Design a protein with these regions (language model features):
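Patatin-like phospholipase
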Residues: 1-50, 58-164
Length: 164
């Protein structure tokens, strides 16, 4: 992998891995496949996700199939989730506080306990705004919930329609 790890550690090699790409609607298709993998109990030693792959891939590690579709359907028409109004009011097309904090912590609970207990290595990829290079961060048990959510947000950030 080209890029650097923000912790300064060497990126470890995995036995079996899953790459979850970004790309908005492609990410939803990917999550349908990942839900089936979860339901069939097909798991990997490690995975890496960028953008939608990071945002939705965390549900694979937390063993919550169907969660992405459920909250997408539930909040699709809520301006706080994704809208021009959200962009004008918060600076984010996808409301960052709503999507990365209120939904997983209050409205459609993310299973942080299972996520952190799962031994599957999960790498998040974001872009360094100064160099344009990929920055890799492994989501580990010691990572604070807020840090995890902010890394997923950074991975999913889109120029012009995101604050950062």
């Amino acid at each position: 992998m080209k890029g650097r790890c923000c912790t300064g550690k060497k990126i470890v090699e995995m036995k079996t891995g899953l790459v979850l790409e970004g790309g908005a609607l492609r990410g939803l298709y990917t999550m349908g496949i990942v839900d089936v993998l979860t339901e069939q109990r097909i798991f990997f030693d490690g995975m890496i996700g960028v953008s939608a792959g990071a945002a939705f891939g965390c549900n694979y590690k937390s063993r919550q199939p169907g969660r992405v579709l459920r909250y997408k359907q539930r909040f699709a028409h809520d301006w706080r989730y994704c809208s021009v109004r959200s962009w004008l009011c918060t600076g984010d097309l996808f409301g960052a506080d709503f999507g990365y904090h209120q939904v997983p912590e209050e409205l459609d609970l993310f299973d942080f306990k299972t996520f952190y207990a799962n031994p599957t290595a999960f790498w998040l990829v974001a872009t360094d705004v100064e160099t344009g290079e990929a920055v890799y961060r492994q989501a580990t048990e010691g990572m604070h919930i807020d840090e995890l959510c902010e890394w997923i947000r950074a991975s999913s950030s889109m120029r012009i329609v995101s604050q950062w």
